[in-house]
Amino acid sequence: IKGAMNILMTGDEKMLNTFIQDFHMKFMKLSPEEIAFPRSCNGIEKFSDNVKSRRRTANKLEERDSKKRKTKTLLGTLDGAKMTYGLFAPGAPIHVKGAILYNHLIEKNKLGNKYPYIQEGDKIKFINMKEPNIYQASAFSFPAKFPKELNLLGCIDYDEQFHKSFIQPLQFITNKINWRIDTSYGMQGTLEDFF
């Protein structure tokens, strides 16, 4: 951002776009730790659908037992209705969804001895994920070190990360001075390339 700010003050639109193209190529080679957004993680329990679903299930079971129903409830259902729950409750912030996913995958892959679980109030980093993905998540969070054992490197949305962390802050200024940012980052073909 500092380099781009210097160009905004002393250069022109073409210089800025050349700088952005060069930086885009460097950015795409950075590690997840280097490109992730820092955040403080609050609301893991509040937005974890597993906690909410356990409470709902307990309430339903109490209600069912109090009515003393004589019919059996099928496996995977509650009072005859199928119950499907995801990892996150509706309205969860993106970085909290990422933290819930991280904790779930660390537990599922038995990596708890190598990587710490994210707790309420922890400082974390989060990255945007390509969608759709097998976890139906838009982000993945981690405490300090990205767990490469989870094989999520291919799911990282570097373009979205670049846009949100670098282009959007620049556009706040370039829009005011009527400069256009070439979002093809030098990858757009020309009519000459066609022939």
Label each residue range with its predicted role.
Residues 1-195:
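DNA-dependent DNA polymerase catalytic subunits
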